[in-house]
Amino acid sequence: MGGGGSALRVCADHRGGINWLSLSPDGQRLLTGSEDGTARLWSTADGQCCALLQGHESYVTFCQLEDEAAFTCSADCTIRRWDVLTGQCLQVYRGHTSIVNRILVANNQLFSSSYDRTARVWSVDKGQMSREFRGHRNCVLTLAYSAPWDLPSTPCAEEAAAGGLLVTGSTDGTAKVWQVASGCCHQTLRGHTGAVLCLVLDTPGHTAFTGSTDATIRAWDILSGEQLRVFREHRGSVICLELVNRLVYSGSADRTVKCWLADTGECVRTFTAHRRNVSALKYHAGTLFTGSGDACARAFDAQSGELRRVFRGHTFIINCIQVHGQVLYTASHDGALRLWDVRGLRGAPRPPPPMRSLSRLFSNKVGCAAAPLQPA
């Protein structure tokens, strides 16, 4: 079993559990959203809180950090945009009638999913709703976006995807593909027998991978709606997915992570050692980092599956992880953000250069190096 990791810093400013953690594209800041109804901005250079974002009237469910703005959504049915330098609220997006689950900023548009059974798209600058996507029979949990330039330039595809395609996953057991320009449902992806908890897009291959409470992952052609393959070896809900080149990593309630060949559905590796469900995944430079309901984060050699390090210190489930340079960031329902030294991990060689474009799902992939931190 791998040795323990040392904590560089513990940031315990939140007064409730942290539901999400986002890293800015330039790697300079982190954003946390909490059960205490606030979000906080943190510097990756020194781990200090640099802004408190207050205004939501209920807990913050999710957040996304861009270079010049922070976005948060909440159980108060709203989304907010914030200035990252001053912490001032710049815009409130109103229209959802229940908890907003997820948001995604892409192509100067803001996408959102909600318990009110809808997804919506908003003008980032004006705060106005552009489209409402109705058709799911239960709450919409997860979403991803494929821009027009990522789709094939055939006459049929061009007409359907002039404004790009939005893919949503719901507790009704389906995923849906929506034409952003028209608001029409392009395809309904049926096959799961449980809620769709997570999804990720391979945009060059116009393929969606969905994970479900039915313990399967399914691959779909988002243009035709065809189910391409089913990944069946998990014995519990599939909670999180990570797509790296032609490999799909899946974290499950069965306490394992599995690595699959995206093109065939073959399981080529299983990562064990977790004592509870696997709640978060992040691949970085040959190392697979995981967060678990057992309150530990772990680092595995992505190629061999060997456990390299265990990071102990949290007292509740780890909801989200990010990696930047030589630092691992973990956010937990115990209310703490922890920074860990990951120097000395000798992971497998880096995989081949990534495909032309991978849809960003709930996180920002950054390759910048963080300024060194001294242990607390």
Swiss-Prot record:
Start and end residues of the WD repeats are 13-52, 55-94, 95-132, 135-188, 191-232, 234-272, 274-310, 313-350
Recorded hits in SUPFAM superfamilies, A to Z, give: Quinoprotein alcohol dehydrogenase-like (SSF50998), WD40 repeat-like (SSF50978)
Signal peptide residue numbers: none
The protein's UniProt keywords, in alphabetical order, are: Repeat, WD repeat
Q: Which Pfam families match?
A: WD40 (PF00400)
What's the superkingdom here?
Eukaryota
List the InterPro entries hit by this protein, alphabetically. Answer: G-protein_beta_WD-40_rep, Quinoprotein_ADH-like_sf, WD40/YVTN_repeat-like_dom_sf, WD40_repeat_CS, WD40_repeat_dom_sf, WD40_rpt, WDR86-like
Q: What is this protein called?
A: WD repeat-containing protein 86
The protein's organism comes out as: Homo sapiens
